[in-house]
From Swiss-Prot:
Keywords: Disulfide bond, Pathogenesis-related protein, Plant defense, Signal, Stress response, Vacuole. It comes from Nicotiana tabacum. Inhibits the germination and growth of the fungus Phytophthora infestans. Residues 1-21 form the signal peptide. The lineage of its organism: Eukaryota, Viridiplantae, Streptophyta, Embryophyta, Tracheophyta. This is Osmotin. Pfam families: Thaumatin.
Length: 246
């Protein structure tokens, strides 16, 4: 009976190990509330300053992203709106957020057993961010950052309340590498790249912006406002936002 019980416990541990490839820890260090969002797993969570949310990501997860929503106001049923990053007016996101929003993107246990991950500004910028493996292993498996004052320095053409749009959102078209086909960096993509060299600045910015870690043995951490404070141009709380659903 004892051996049977031990075997069952071992089976459960093995099943958990097999099912989850990584944990994604999301932490808010901003001096304001951030409503974190995660798809296709996780949904959403209110994070006051200093709070953390841990997401268990299954093996093979791909096209996944984590972002922060700002100046949100949700009712007790989890319905409402956000100034940036809104995902259809719900707390629990099932689709992508409305730009602008700084993105942490990842795909787990893919080609050659590697995790692929990045910070993307292809949907613009709203919150400074660090994305890092908790157990870096060298090479391209190390912390990456986008912490510049992009909102404060945003070109006039891309400015919106609470953030800075990518030109693909504002203008679209091949001129800004928003469609398939050869293209190079533009004035606007250079603006983002110079301030956040680790991050994707336009859709075809792969060579300097994709990072890899060993799949199945690496966990990750996303930190909003990693320096613990926001620039003056970053969003403040909306009136009544302390009455949102938690």
């Amino acid at each position: 009976m004892g051996n049977l019980r031990s075997s069952f416990v071992f089976f459960l541990l093995a099943l958990v190990t097999y099912t989850y490839a990584a944990t994604i820890e999301v932490r808010n260090n901003c001096p304001y509330t951030v409503w974190a969002a995660s798809t296709p797993i996780g949904g959403g969570r209110r994070l006051d300053r200093g709070q953390t949310w841990v997401i268990n990501a299954p093996r093979g997860t791909k096209m996944a992203r984590v972002w922060g929503r700002t100046n949100c106001n949700f009712n007790a049923a989890g319905r409402g709106t956000c100034q940036t990053g809104d995902c259809g007016g719900v707390l629990q996101c099932t689709g992508w957020g409305k730009p602008p929003n700084t993105l942490a993107e990842y795909a787990l246990d893919q080609f050659s057993g590697l995790d692929f991950w990045d910070i993307s500004l292809v949907d613009g910028f709203n919150i400074p961010m660090t994305f890092a493996p908790t157990n870096p292993s060298g090479g391209k498996c190390h912390a990456i950052h986008c912490t510049a004052n992009i909102n404060g320095e945003c070109p006039r053409e891309l400015r919106v309340p609470g953030g800075c749009n990518n030109p693909c959102t504002t203008f679209g078209g091949q001129q800004y590498c928003c469609t398939q086909g050869p293209c190079g960096p533009t004035f606007f993509s250079k603006f983002f790249k110079q301030r956040c060299p680790d991050a994707y600045s336009y859709p075809q910015d792969d060579p300097t912006s994709t990072f890899t870690c060993p799949g199945g043995s690496t966990n990750y951490r996303v930190i909003f406002c990693p320096n613990g404070q926001a620039h003056p141009n970053f969003p403040l709380e909306m009136p009544g936002s302390d009455e949102v659903a938690k």
